[in-house]
């Protein structure tokens, strides 16, 4: 068995209908990601198992946008000599079809009722009620139908009422399991997300999405919205996830941040392809390496995060290092 396993970690790619045309200046940064992986990741990383995408693959959930994303991800897979289907993804707010979740639609009415719930018990009760009601259960996933059918389904990461979360297992070097686990944070996402210009609408997760405890399993979750963007009374869901998920990957905020809460490592990823109108435009992505190490007869999970950042000249991705460090990665 190989010593460690690795992943390429992307988030917020935002492919548009113009991506790849003759005037797309962001084609350069995507090319530089491919070049960086070819020149550097292949020599630094052992046993790359896949590409992780924490949502906002598309800009407006159009089929053509997902087709372009698929081509880009295939190029990465080809460089790494892994299967083109070794992609693991979750939806973001840009992956919803806003024409489905319009005001007055059945979905919008259900979302509005869910948004009114103000306790964990009420949230879980309403989610369970709508999910079990045959007249409405499929409606909860209607706004990501294009995402599911034209993109995520190709990687077995599509979600629905029968499979609200996906999971994939990889063997660790101590014969235990690393389990990737997809969380859906866009249940109530709609065109109203930014209706209040002073604050964003908080998203609902629900306890039904918290992975179950299982001996010998280490969880690494993917979710678009981080916990500070959740409507989570008393932080009930977050507390459960912090206890059960050792590595948590998030997107959405376009801010690179790594922190620890007890035994859980929380990685907020910067945007791979942010809008150039965004203040502090700063394309980023990560490499992640995971292994179990033994120290004085005890075993520990060792995680290395290689933070990659585009240079100001936009000519290559390099390691984002602390001023006082020469390390190419952060180790936890």
Language model segments and positions:
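A short C-terminal boundary segment appended to hydrolase-like catalytic domains
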Residues: 290-332
């Amino acid at each position: 068995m190989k010593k460690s396993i690795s992943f390429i970690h992307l988030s917020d790619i935002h492919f548009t209908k113009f991506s790849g045309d003759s005037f797309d200046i962001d084609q350069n940064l995507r090319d530089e990601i491919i070049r960086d992986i070819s020149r550097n990741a292949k020599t630094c990383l052992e046993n790359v198992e896949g590409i992780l995408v924490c949502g906002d693959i598309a800009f407006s959930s159009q089929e053509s946008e997902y087709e372009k994303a698929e081509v880009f991800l295939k190029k990465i897979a080809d460089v790494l000599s892994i299967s083109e289907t070794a992609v693991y993804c979750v939806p973001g707010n840009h992956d919803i079809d806003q024409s489905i979740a319009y005001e007055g639609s059945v979905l919008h009415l259900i979302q509005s009722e869910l948004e009114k719930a103000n306790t964990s018990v009420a949230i879980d009760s309403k989610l369970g009620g709508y999910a079990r009601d045959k007249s409405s259960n499929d409606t909860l996933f209607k706004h990501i139908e294009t995402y599911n059918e034209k993109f995520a389904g190709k990687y077995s990461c599509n979600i629905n009422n029968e499979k609200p979360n996906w999971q994939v297992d990889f063997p660790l070097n101590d014969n235990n399991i690393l389990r990737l686990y997809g969380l859906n944070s866009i249940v109530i996402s709609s065109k109203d997300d930014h209706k209040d210009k002073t604050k964003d609408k908080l998203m609902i997760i629900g306890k039904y999405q918290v992975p179950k405890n299982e001996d010998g399993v280490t969880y690494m979750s993917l979710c678009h919205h981080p916990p500070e963007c959740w409507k989570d009374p008393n932080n009930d869901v977050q507390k459960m996830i912090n206890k059960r998920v050792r590595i948590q990957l998030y997107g959405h905020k376009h801010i690179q941040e790594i922190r620890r809460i007890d035994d859980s490592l929380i990685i907020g990823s910067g945007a791979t392809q942010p809008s150039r109108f965004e203040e502090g435009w700063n394309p980023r992505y990560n490499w992640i390496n995971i292994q179990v190490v033994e120290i004085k007869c005890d075993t520990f999970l060792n995680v290395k995060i290689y933070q990659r950042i585009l240079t100001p000249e936009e000519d290559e991705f390099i390691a984002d290092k602390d001023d006082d460090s020469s390390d190419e990665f952060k180790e936890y």
